[in-house]
Amino acid sequence: MQILLVEDDNTLFQELKKELEQWDFNVAGIEDFGKVMDTFESFNPEIVILDVQLPKYDGFYWCRKMREVSNVPILFLSSRDNPMDQVMSMELGADDYMQKPFYTNVLIAKLQAIYRRVYEFTAEEKRTLTWQDAVVDLSKDSIQKGDDTIFLSKTEMIILEILITKKNQIVSRDTIITALWDDEAFVSDNTLTVNVNRLRKKLSEISMDSAIETKVGKGYMAHE
């Protein structure tokens, strides 16, 4: 597994690199924190571990840049005790979030879970669903409508799959939150709202933002 570890604390970087390599992970770091994307594109990581507080530009900036060109899983690290960091990471399409200090074995377990979810599942037979006049590719986390294609984060795709497998039915927020927790994603009532709003924003790019309806006090419904 190729891991890009974007961490400016060299002591922590070396400790994590040593631990991860004991699990046969191939770990690369950053030499110039103004050129993170250069390393990202040349190393082609399978998972990115991204610190929030970085020199020159913060982790949120680099997450945006990565999401412009890739749907690679991103796990944020943060030493700040600020719930908005977690919300922001969700809005930007991160797959997980850990607050420092943390147990290394928990980090490794999260990385393994992300890898299984993203790469082992997508290696299976292609799974698609038809929704309105679009094709939802569950293996690629994408939606194609005509000549246009959008890409979703893992959390967004889980939400969408739940809704479109129960088309024209109200799915409660609690049902979705439970499914996300079972999938080891990080989620709360507020971050669910953030994810649904971000999902709608992406759907608007293919003129499908009204395809998911909010049922106030009840949940959400995907229309046929």
Curated annotation (Swiss-Prot):
PTM remark: Phosphorylated by GraS. Phosphorylated by Stk1; phosphorylation increases the DNA-binding activity of GraR.
Stated name of the protein: Response regulator protein GraR
Lineage: Bacteria, Bacillati, Bacillota, Bacilli, Bacillales
Gene ablation phenotype (knockout): Deletion leads to complete loss of resistance towards host cationic antimicrobial peptides (CAPs).
Domain of life of the native organism: Bacteria
Post-translational modification 4-aspartylphosphate, affected residues: D51
Subunit structure: Interacts with GraX.
Cellular compartments annotated: Cytoplasm
Organism, scientific name: Staphylococcus aureus (strain MW2)
Residues in the DNA-binding region annotation: 126-224
Keywords: Activator, Antibiotic resistance, Cytoplasm, DNA-binding, Phosphoprotein, Repressor, Transcription, Transcription regulation, Two-component regulatory system, Virulence
